[in-house]
């Protein structure tokens, strides 16, 4: 997209990475109809919603699209896995530039309210039982988000460990057959479960999980502070502060796009 129309909201160069991942629009067999809104315009509008937290109906007139067009295209692209693939592509570029630190990975979660309910919501133990969800994040040693996930607020953190770590290890470029694996995993006492420690050792991943009632959280926390910063980066995208989407796939899509933006900004800052 370069320094184009939407450079005020879309980081330079991001559209060029995203464009090949966008599924083609369906063509009416009978022809006719109105001309499709350009994909890059919709892409910019989606990022605006993520950053500002506004409702689809509150999109500024400068985008020149209706709320139904923007939301419909967002749902189609989310179903096609565009946001996860965009995040993955940027993570690979970071790896190619030797900007990922896999000497350790850090895992944590954060609660978000989900007033509209829907799948993957439940009574939040930290919000007086109100409906909520959790965002789960696995980062590298520098806090770059590698894998993101969503669960109900009443699901125990430990249940996310295997899916998050397995998702990290199976993210690979099919043309290179390359797998990423951290040397050690840092997490707080919520993940202190014997069978998870055994599972990690079976994967040849060092276990640095705080033990309940034994190890000081302050000592191990020296390595885990980066994930708190990562959560701050992600929740800086206002659409993530409250889950408005009843469909968890759509909330996960916004979370994946936010993770992609965090990683892309680091890539640009360290390579230009």
Show where each model-derived region lies.
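Short alpha-helical elements
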Residues: 1-272
């Amino acid at each position: 997209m370069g320094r184009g129309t939407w450079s005020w909201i879309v980081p330079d160069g991001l559209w060029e990475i995203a464009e090949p991942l966008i599924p083609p629009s369906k063509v009416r067999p009978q022809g006719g109809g109105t001309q499709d809104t350009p994909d890059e315009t919709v892409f910019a509008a989606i990022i605006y919603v993520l950053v500002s937290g506004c409702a689809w109906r509150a999109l500024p007139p400068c985008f020149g699209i209706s709320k139904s067009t923007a939301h419909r295209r967002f749902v189609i692209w989310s179903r096609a896995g565009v946001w996860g693939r965009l995040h993955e592509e940027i993570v690979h570029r970071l790896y190619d530039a030797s900007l990922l630190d896999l000497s350790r990975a850090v895992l944590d979660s954060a609660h978000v309210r989900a007033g509209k309910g829907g799948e993957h919501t439940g009574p939040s133990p930290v919000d007086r039982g109100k409906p909520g969800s959790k965002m789960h994040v696995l980062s590298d040693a520098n806090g770059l988000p590698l894998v993101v996930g969503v669960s109900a607020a009443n699901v125990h953190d430990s249940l996310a460990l295997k899916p998050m770590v397995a998702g990290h290890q199976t993210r690979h470029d099919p043309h290179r057959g390359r797998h990423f694996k951290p040397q050690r995993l840092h997490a707080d006492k919520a993940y202190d479960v014997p069978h998870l420690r055994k599972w990690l050792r079976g994967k040849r991943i060092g276990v640095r999980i705080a033990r309940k009632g034994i190890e000081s959280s302050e000592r191990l926390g020296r390595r885990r502070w980066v994930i708190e910063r990562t959560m701050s980066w992600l929740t800086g995208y206002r659409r993530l502060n409250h889950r408005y989407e009843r469909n968890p796939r759509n909330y996960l899509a916004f979370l994946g796009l936010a993770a992609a933006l965090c990683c892309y900004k680091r890539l640009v800052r360290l390579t230009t």
